[in-house]
Swiss-Prot record:
Keyword Nucleotide-binding: no
Family according to the record: Belongs to the Mediator complex subunit 16 family.
Reported function: Component of the Mediator complex, a coactivator involved in the regulated transcription of nearly all RNA polymerase II-dependent genes. Mediator functions as a bridge to convey information from gene-specific regulatory proteins to the basal RNA polymerase II transcription machinery. Mediator is recruited to promoters by direct interactions with regulatory proteins and serves as a scaffold for the assembly of a functional preinitiation complex with RNA polymerase II and the general transcription factors.
GO terms, biological process: positive regulation of DNA-templated transcription
Subcellular location field: Nucleus
Principal location: nucleus
Lineage, uppermost ranks: Eukaryota, Fungi, Dikarya, Ascomycota, Saccharomycotina
Name used for this protein in its record: Mediator of RNA polymerase II transcription subunit 16
Organism: Yarrowia lipolytica (strain CLIB 122 / E 150)
Lineage: superkingdom: Eukaryota
Alphabetic keyword roster: Activator, Nucleus, Transcription, Transcription regulation
Any single Gene Ontology cellular-component annotation: mediator complex
């Protein structure tokens, strides 16, 4: 047992150098009583107890990283591996088998005998874009690899030079690391506000025996609950990076700051270094963390095993011509310990940027420290506040004098202690998600504690909700006797986490912990609100949200089991609230821009969610799912036609037209044109069935008729049809010298139009009737949004649209009296995945229909290009991990494919449903 009374800055304490160079075998200095003040600058009598220490742990030791695209990188026995979630049969989701990303053979042996012989991977971290992966070894060497898609070759962007392999002992080990976020607008969701509630909302879900079908708003009206959502604009925090640059920053045990920068996409990373302090024995650090600030700088907190905390302000001056310049200012050096005085070792340290409107304007960052002993863990939360000192700045600078780091600041920084919590459950790691707006602490038994750090509404007209826990969700503890994780990686949506065991990566999904017998209508509605809000957060922050949809599916199954009368109502409530939370209304205005529908990524995610929650085992999809599947196809067709027609029309002056490229582009649209023509035939088959069955046909669920009556989907269909007409016009304009390829392209397009069972002229006439009458109906109805949701969520034709539906049948009857429609009876459109037909005759739409990505002869269909896949030597098949669609992969480096301006280039990384492409060998 040793005792000492440290001075304010700990500069005169004598320590055993060996304990500081090697992983320290020291206990944290502690006090038997709580310090009397909240600021941590008081001299305290402290004790080092070597008998009660735990296993030492350094910073920057994250063995798993989950990127925004859904790819999980982890350190395995053979090197760095990657996994991702895939849907195997339409309902069950599993982790793929690991794929070796960076083998451990890339670790180069030390070049001198003074280096610790063991070198292993210890830290992985994805870049903000999710394309570059930083890999750090135990001696501080940094490797950066990049992969544009899961099928593209892996590129090494940074490999440590030979001089980095002569590290003395482990002083160059990196103990703090982060990627520098690019400067871009930050949009954050505010907590939702719910209000109201009646006696029916208190009813147990198991007691709900009868519920009328209808529009989605009936469930809210039944419970008397209302809700509002909101978003806010956030500031970019941290250094401003020039457009196209990439950067990451780290600090070593000897307090050497390292900045790796990239001068453009796919360019190698270069290193810039700055020594923060002279190498004294008590300047060796074990943990460090970075956080961006509003003045476009960074704060760096470093912790020494001697019990000292160092705080620096880091500034980066960027230059496109020269290497960036680093400047550092030491703000303070103080003692840091638990307030309780219990002997413990610091095992985790994190700085978090300030996103909340509930903190002081002087607060620059939040710091959380975890101290661990043999009995449990203590978490201390602090605020870093900057004040203008009362003394002259000359006197103040004497207290922060440093020969290596600049000390010209005129502000004094304080560490203000806020909260200390103690638990007997060991904390394995802490972290944050969604731009530091959510803090989490992961325990070794699998329990996670979350805390919201974002903006708080000032309104008192409702109860706020934001986190999963606000609706009763939590993670179930790991089974007793199972492997205890040493690191837990939380997904970007906070709906799941993964951890490593001896058997590989394991996945756990958040569960609703409210017992089935206690679940009320109000709690069910709360669940819909929270799930919709968390889904909107993933849409706004553009992160993969497969795990959120998994939670939705579980809750739908639970509600359906407890209250069969709500089997359809709860999914419809989820859909309606998800659209409301993202502020996307299906009731579009007349002047709504077409590009906002085609390119809107949030709409794509909403449609994907509707498809996923309506898909069951065997890839069978109910009508709700098929409606969104059709909408996604229309979005794909309209985007591809627009993209291609613009590429063809943008002829550079003075440059001869590239006829080969032109023909290649036009031929690539053949499958999409076929999809539009077959959808028109499918619509006519529905009209034929309605004509034969009579008015009762309109009381059932449908796909084609609701799609042409709803305003948003009708806009896409009209736009696609006009694109096809423009495509035919271009093909009729023959060049001066027509090549054989051009002739074949023209012939192919003419054949598509010729062999369709319905003439394009009739469909245009029918479509004009629908468009004009639908506008008249919608203008005279107050609740147009409810009508749109009834069409696109349920596939039901509202009462207000029945006269229009009958008018369409009358127009079709007139047409078939003068035209031979016998081919329509036997025309197979099952490949669209929208309906099933047997024996060549239309059948009523079944409740469920399997999705087919193969023809009747077993040939696979390219779900992206809409043509039959013919396997050629060297071709690679890719599969969507979400919808199981199959497509041919074409490497973007192949210049013959004109991928830079080819419409398929937009879907090189992701499927048109938003899922990730994976190699067919991984399987789904």
């Amino acid at each position: 047992m040793y005792q000492y009374a440290p001075s304010h800055n700990l500069d005169h304490i004598e320590w055993n150098h060996a304990h500081l160079i090697y992983p320290p075998n020291l206990a944290i200095p502690t006090s038997p009583v709580n310090p009397p003040a909240t600021q941590l600058n008081q001299p305290v009598q402290m004790t080092i107890d070597f008998d009660s220490i735990i296993e030492p742990k350094l910073g920057a030791r994250e063995s798993i990283s989950w990127n925004r695209n859904g790819i999980i990188a982890s350190i395995g026995d053979e090197g760095v591996e990657t996994n991702l979630l895939v849907c195997t049969d339409g309902q069950d989701w599993v982790l793929t088998k690991p794929t070796l990303y960076a083998p451990k053979s890339i670790l180069q042996p030390p070049t001198t005998s003074f280096v610790t012989p063991h070198r292993a991977f210890c830290h992985v971290e994805w870049s903000p874009s999710g394309s570059d992966l930083a890999i750090i070894d135990t001696l501080g060497s940094l490797y950066i690899y990049s992969q544009y898609t899961t099928l593209s070759p892996i590129t090494c962007l940074r490999k440590p030079p030979s001089e980095e392999l002569t590290t003395p002992i482990d002083l160059n080990a990196i103990v703090g690391f982060t990627w520098v976020a690019p400067e871009k607008p930050v949009i954050l969701t505010n907590p939702g506000l719910k209000a109201g509630g009646n006696e029916k909302s208190k009813q147990k879900l198991s007691d709900v025996k009868d519920f009328p079908t209808g529009q989605t708003s009936q469930l809210l009206g039944y419970s008397g609950i209302s809700v509002t959502y909101g978003v806010s604009q956030g500031l970019h925090l941290g250094p401003r990076i020039p457009q196209g640059f990439g950067a990451c920053i780290g600090v070593t045990r000897s307090q050497v700051l390292k900045l790796w920068t990239q001068n453009g996409p796919s360019q190698p990373y270069n290193l810039v270094k700055l020594s923060l302090n002279q190498l004294h024995s008590d300047d060796i650090i074990s943990h460090a963390s970075f956080a961006g600030t509003k003045d476009h700088k960074m704060l760096l907190a470093c912790y020494s095993p001697a019990g000292a905390i160092y705080l620096y302000r880091i500034e980066v001056e960027w230059s496109k011509e020269e290497e960036p310049k680093l400047r550092a200012t030491r703000l303070l050096k103080e003692t840091l310990m638990p307030q309780s005085g219990a002997p413990a070792r610091l095992t985790d340290l994190k700085l978090f940027s300030i996103r909340s409107n509930q903190v002081s304007s002087e607060t620059e960052a939040e710091m959380v420290c975890v101290f661990t002993d043999t009995k449990g863990a203590t978490t201390n939360r602090y605020e870093l506040q900057s004040h203008t000192p009362d003394l002259n700045s000359t006197f103040y600078s004497l207290g922060t004098n440093d020969s290596s780091a600049s000390s010209t600041t005129t502000h004094k920084t304080h560490i203000i202690s806020l909260v200390e919590t103690t638990t007997s459950n060991k904390i394995v790691n802490i972290g944050s998600q969604v731009y530091d707006s959510i803090f989490f602490a992961a325990h070794e038994d699998g329990i996670l504690n979350f805390r919201y750090r974002g903006n708080v509404s000032s309104s008192t007209k409702g109860t706020p909700f934001n986190m999963f826990s606000d609706a009763g969700y939590a993670f179930t503890p790991l089974p007793k006797g199972s492997d205890r994780p040493d690191y837990i990686c939380v997904s970007p949506t906070c709906a799941s986490y993964v951890y490593k065991t001896k058997d590989g990566l394991k996945l756990r999904i958040i569960d609703n912990k409210i017992p089935d017998a206690d679940l009320t209508v109000a709690q069910m509605v709360d669940s819909a609100f929270v799930l919709s809000l968390r889904h909107s957060v993933s849409c706004i922050s553009a992160v993969c949200n497969d795990d959120v949809m998994m939670v939705m599916r579980r809750e739908i199954q639970r509600v359906s089991k407890l209250a069969p009368a709500l089997e359809t109502q709860f999914p419809l409530l989820l859909l309606a609230e998800s659209h409301k939370a993202i502020n996307f209304s299906l009731d579009l205005k007349k002047d709504h821009q077409m590009d906002k529908i085609m390119i809107n990524p949030s709409l794509q995610r909403l449609l994907t969610m509707q498809t996923v929650i309506g898909t069951q085992h065997g890839w069978t999809r109910n009508v709700t799912s098929r409606l969104s599947w059709c909408f996604l196809n229309l979005r794909l067709v309209s985007f591809s036609l627009t993209f291609t027609l613009r590429a063809i029309g943008q002829q550079k002056p003075g440059v001869a037209p590239n006829h080969a490229m032109r023909i290649h582009y036009l031929m690539s649209l053949s499958g999409l044109k076929r999809w539009c023509l077959d959808f028109a035939a499918y619509l006519c088959q529905e009209l034929l069935a309605a004509s034969n069955e009579g008015p009762s046909y309109f009381q059932k669920q449908h796909v084609a008729l609701p799609m042409v009556m709803a305003r948003s989907s009708r806009m896409l269909l009209m736009y696609s049809w006009r694109g096809i007409r423009s495509l035919d016009t271009i093909l009729m304009q023959k060049p001066g010298t027509e090549t054989q390829e051009a002739g074949l392209a023209s012939q192919r397009q003419r054949e598509l139009s010729h062999f369709t069972p319905i003439s394009m002229t009739f469909f245009e006439q029918l479509f004009n009737v629908i468009d004009s009458h639908t506008k008249q109906v919608a203008e005279n109805v107050e609740d147009r949004l409810g009508l749109e949701q009834q069409l696109l969520f349920q596939g039901m034709i509202p009462q207000q649209f029945l006269p229009l539906a009958k008018r369409c049948v009358d127009e079709f009857d007139k047409f078939r009296k003068t035209n031979d429609l016998s081919p329509l009876y036997f025309y197979n459109v099952s490949w669209l995945g929208l309906d099933e037909h047997y024996d060549g005759r239309p059948a009523p739409t079944p409740a469920m229909a399997p999705y087919r990505n193969v023809t009747s002869t077993g040939l696979k269909i390219d779900c992206l290009r809409k043509f039959i896949i013919e396997r050629q030597e060297g071709s690679i098949l890719r599969v969507c991990q979400r919808c199981a669609g199959t497509s041919v992969f074409v490497d973007s480096s192949d210049g013959k494919q004109f991928t830079g301006t080819h419409w398929t280039f937009a879907f090189q990384r992701n499927c048109w449903c938003g899922g990730m492409w994976i190699p067919e060998s991984l399987g789904v």
